[in-house]
From Swiss-Prot:
GO terms for cellular component: cytosolic small ribosomal subunit. This is Small ribosomal subunit protein uS2. The gene is rpsB. It comes from the Bacteria. One of its GO terms (molecular function) is structural constituent of ribosome. SUPFAM superfamilies: Ribosomal protein S2. The keyword tRNA processing does not apply. It holds the Pfam family Ribosomal_S2. One of its GO terms (biological process) is translation. Keywords: Ribonucleoprotein, Ribosomal protein. The lineage of its organism: Bacteria, Pseudomonadati, Elusimicrobiota, Endomicrobiia, Endomicrobiales. Belongs to the universal ribosomal protein uS2 family.
Length: 244
C-alpha cells in the first residue's frame, strides 16, 4: 500500500462528515467530534480501516476473485470508472440496474445483445442497414452502454464489492448481501456501517476524498493480481526444472 498519511487524508477532506442532524448513531464509534454542526471523522480510525481493507482486497484478488466498483453519484462516477479501468475491475458508475447481481442471467442476455451490436459496427454490417434501423439500434446501443460499459466482460458474479457511499448504493449492497458477496464500503456519518462487511469511515462527497479511496482500493487489486502473476511464474519455473 502506498504510504497514505494523516496529512494526505486531511488535505483530501476525508475528515468532514455530514451535518450532525443527519448522522446515523451507528457511526458514533468513528466520529472524533463536531465543528460548526458538522461531524468530524476520526482519521486515526479511517487510516486503520483503510490499511486493513487494503489487505482484505489484496488477499481476495490474489486468489483470482473479481471485484466490482460501485459509485453512481456525481462525485463518484469518474473516480470509480478511472480506477476500475486502471486495475481491471468491473464497475457501475451510472444507475444501478435492479437485479444486476440477483438476476444475473437476465443481465448476461443484455451483455450479449450489447456485444452483438458492437460486432455489427466493427464488421460493417451496421452500415448495410436502413437509416431508420441504424437509428433504432444506435439508440439501443447508447442505452445499453450507459448501463453495461463496466460490466460487458463480467461472465460470472464478482467475489467482492467496493462501494463509495453505502447510504446511496443501498440496492447494490442488498443484492450483494443476499448473495453473500463481501462488501468494502466508504461510509460517511449518515451511513449504517452494519450493512457492509468492511466499512471505511470517511467523506464520500468530496471529489478528492473519493479519488483517494478509489485509488487505494485499485492499488490493492493490482497488488493482488501481481501476486497471482508471481505464483504463475514460479509454477512455470518449477515445471521447467522438472523437465530438465
Amino acid at each position: 500500500m502506498a504510504n497514505i498519511t494523516m496529512k494526505a487524508l486531511l488535505e483530501a477532506g476525508v475528515h468532514f462528515g455530514h451535518q450532525t442532524r443527519r448522522w446515523n448513531p451507528k457511526m458514533a464509534k468513528f466520529i472524533f467530534g463536531m465543528r460548526n454542526k458538522i461531524h468530524i471523522i476520526d482519521l486515526q480510525k479511517t487510516l486503520k480501516e483503510l490499511k486493513k481493507n487494503y489487505k482484505v482486497v489484496r488477499d481476495f484478488t490474489s486468489t483470482g476473485k473479481d471485484i466490482i466498483f460501485v459509485g453512481t453519484k456525481k462525485q463518484a462516477r469518474l473516480p470509480i470508472k478511472e480506477e476500475a479501468l486502471r486495475c481491471g475491475a468491473y464497475f457501475v458508475s451510472e444507475r444501478w440496474l435492479g437485479g444486476t447481481l440477483t438476476n444475473f442471467e437476465t443481465l448476461k442476455k443484455s451483455i450479449t445483445r450489447y456485444k452483438e451490436i458492437e460486432d455489427m459496427k466493427e464488421t460493417g454490417v451496421f452500415k448495410l442497414l436502413s437509416k431508420k434501423e441504424q437509428s433504432r439500434i444506435e439508440k439501443e446501443r447508447i442505452k445499453l452502454e450507459k448501463s453495461l460499459e463496466g460490466l460487458k466482460n463480467m461472465s460470472s458474479l464478482p467475489g467482492l464489492m467496493f462501494v463509495v457511499d453505502s447510504h446511496e448504493e443501498t440496492t447494490a449492497i442488498l443484492e450483494a448481501r443476499k448473495l453473500e458477496i463481501p462488501i468494502v464500503a466508504v461510509c460517511d456519518t449518515n451511513c449504517n456501517p452494519d450493512l457492509v462487511d468492511y466499512p471505511i469511515p470517511g467523506n464520500d462527497d468530496a471529489i478528492r476524498a473519493v479519488k483517494l479511496f478509489c485509488t487505494v482500493i485499485a492499488d490493492a487489486v493490482l497488488e493482488g493480481k501481481s501476486i497471482i502473476g508471481k505464483q504463475e511464474d514460479n509454477k512455470v519455473k518449477e515445471a521447467a526444472i522438472e523437465v530438465k
